[in-house]
């Protein structure tokens, strides 16, 4: 082929370039740019809202607190005078930001005289509700009342029995439901509803958190200051109301991880949140309790830590409880949590995992995922009854 053609079609001409020396190849590999390592700090800086699903930050009370101290949780736009109004998405300068699943202050500046919430607790799963009530117990003075209004499961089922669509009916007009079962499902889930109660189930939940549930009307509380604060009434809604009276004090203990096994920690961000990658099968984060505790004396356990890699598996984590009797595990369901870093166990889970409520727990561990998974690691929160 002639010279001009070689310039136009160089690929048609055989290459006569010398191969690079062996040492040059080695050096190019050594100095070649490596893929950037994913860091949680970068996600926090660039997308703090997304990173917040895997991290946490201790809630902060306003600097100036009224005396007496009355708390209003999940206030939305219903700002109440005489209360410290708290909401995860403040719409008003009078409202302080508060994520009910982030750690609460400890100790509190002073015990709260009481609390009020309406249409709030049902937006969390059952174990999360227990966590919230345990934190609330620790914030309240002895005998104080946490007033709670929410939709009643029993009243919802009764309303939906024999459901048939009709003009102007809320569930049909808003969600297009046309059958009884669909109406019940819509009522339990719309607007972020996650777990409804009847009188019996709420009383049990309250008892686990050290409260006695006293049924009231939606308007009248056993505490005058908490009466007539309601937005909804029994007429025209499924609402029901209870005063949760603090009967047994609950104490929260927070422990830093004692051992991190099979996980390469890459960095630490925020409030001592470790971020790393699982390197071995059977990786664990362990917390040694200050002293042995019978499983039946523990109201709630939360091992903080999220898995950022596995979104299709719902049972990849386990809580492991150890004592002189041996070891028992409780599988965690990722679909039953509002926030990825919450790894909760209720009293029934503790008793089942340990083989009895009388068995003593000395150590708790979290198995956070499989090899290659990126995870956050935080403290263990134990809520125990102050007998």
What are the roles of these predicted feature ranges?
Residues 1-66:
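Membrane-proximal basic amphipathic "stem/tether" segments
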Residues 66-158, 242-247:
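Conserved SAM-binding loop
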Residues 128-131, 135-141, 145-245:
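S-adenosyl-L-methionine-dependent methyltransferase catalytic module, highlighting the catalytic core
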Residues 248-292, 311-314, 325-326, 331, ...:
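Glycan-recognition and processing domains
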Residues 285-314, 319, 342-346, 350, ...:
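Extra-cytoplasmic beta-strand recognition segments
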Residues 298, 350-367:
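Noncatalytic modules at the cell exterior or secretory-pathway interfaces
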Residues 324-357:
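Extracellular carbohydrate recognition and processing domains
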